[in-house]
Amino acid sequence: RFKKIRRLGALPGLTSKRPRSGSDPKNQLRSGKRSQYRIRLEEKQKLRFHYGLTERQLLKYVHIAGKAKGSTGQVLLQLLEMRLDNILFRLGMASTIPGARQLVNHRHILVNGRIVDIPSYRCKPRDIITTKDKQRSKALIQNYIASSPHEELPNHLTIDPFQYKGLVNQIIDSKWIGLKIN
């Protein structure tokens, strides 16, 4: 993970840890003119590693975004931000996106009262995201919420930390996307 972060910059969804600055002498050797191919490849890799996608999944999202109305880049980021694993990460119910994927895969999360075990589930406005009533599920979420620093919540989400409940108000606005993409 540190190799990816050193190469691509900060990826908050992948890990909250940061490499020491100035500790990589190889990085200084790679300066110089960056080709268009390299820039596009790095931006694609940022998306893949931040959201935890395979190449095939990313291509499907690009295809869907290309067919939709509006800017393909903005629609792509909206599609990725409305995934269930990413919304759990944004709500603070998980420290990283891989951690949120694990919560979903282990059936700890309910969407509108139904168990959802697919991390790529596309959330819609007015979806209610809760934990299962089991004590173990609530304890996991409680630990994440207590240990995570309380960052500003995007305006398309609301959370009730005492009931372990989150609500998707609307589709995300482009200014709240946490990843800087060129």
From Swiss-Prot:
Signal peptide boundaries: none
Domain S4 RNA-binding: 82-143
CDD domains, per database record: S4
GO cellular component: chloroplast; small ribosomal subunit
InterPro entries membership: Ribosomal_uS4, Ribosomal_uS4_bac-type, Ribosomal_uS4_CS, Ribosomal_uS4_N, S4_RNA-bd, S4_RNA-bd_sf
Keyword Coiled coil carried by entry: no
Keyword set, alphabetical order: Chloroplast, Plastid, Ribonucleoprotein, Ribosomal protein, RNA-binding, rRNA-binding
Cellular location(s): Plastid, Chloroplast
Region annotation Disordered: where it falls in the sequence: 13-34
SUPFAM superfamilies: Alpha-L RNA-binding motif (SSF55174)
GO biological processes: ribosomal small subunit biogenesis; translation
Main localization category: plastid
One annotated GO molecular function: structural constituent of ribosome
NCBIfam families listed in its UniProt record: PRK05327.1, rpsD_bact
Main function: One of the primary rRNA binding proteins, it binds directly to 16S rRNA where it nucleates assembly of the body of the 30S subunit.
Subunit structure: Part of the 30S ribosomal subunit. Contacts protein S5. The interaction surface between S4 and S5 is involved in control of translational fidelity.
Family the UniProt entry places it in: Belongs to the universal ribosomal protein uS4 family.
Annotated protein name in UniProt: Small ribosomal subunit protein uS4c
Species annotation: Iris lutescens (Crimean iris)
